[in-house]
């Protein structure tokens, strides 16, 4: 593979440093090159290119806001024999600690970004003269994303929808439960879902949801910091409800309390927050069931039962 990387990156220098890393889904390694250090993720699955292209699109969308720091994506390379490699900027990272509060502020600003574009658009509509066009960021008025993204290795359909409950029920929960039905034919999951899906709209009564650009998989393994500030990576972005972002962050720990305090200082909890958080955590339990097996069956079904009480 190193010969392929040299050719694709047009570098004479290609020297691995640090140890090889293995995440839940892909393997990774850092290299020195003529143009500086890079980090290369490798995945041998047949859908690896699609997975990495979704990550590139996510990183580019997050980067374009200027509000959060992410590794700069560079290139996706097809590998002989199947799979792909994804080359990105190398950042010397350590676990999130002193920068947690700053990250909370930045994530809130990210989630408010599209709403502020909407406010700007309304102001311009009330102003005589032509509205700015071209490279200016545009308000996104629907839920979804312009391409498929993968949360783990599972592709997520991001077809645009006008309302959030429909998008979330169809393209997140139903999609995960379809996979569970295919692989496990779990009768109890099927029965609980048939009762739960009709109740989902009730959790959003009276709530205005402006599409927010999300990281999409914000657990502690996808956040870090360096001497400059906080960093987020491995996104599966889409435009959705800002509360969705917090579900996995609260599920598995690793985020200091200061992160949530700083976040909610800018975006206070709306009525019904805790019940919706359960709904969003259900997605993550189902996704883990599909990735890692039956040990996540019990929390998945338990969460559905709690939502039905």
From Swiss-Prot:
Its EC number is 2.7.1.171, 2.7.1.172. Belongs to the fructosamine kinase family. The gene is FN3K. The active site is at residue 217. Pfam families: Fructosamin_kin (PF03881). SUPFAM superfamilies: Protein kinase-like (PK-like) (SSF56112). The keyword Transferase applies. One of its GO terms (biological process) is protein deglycation. This is Fructosamine-3-kinase.
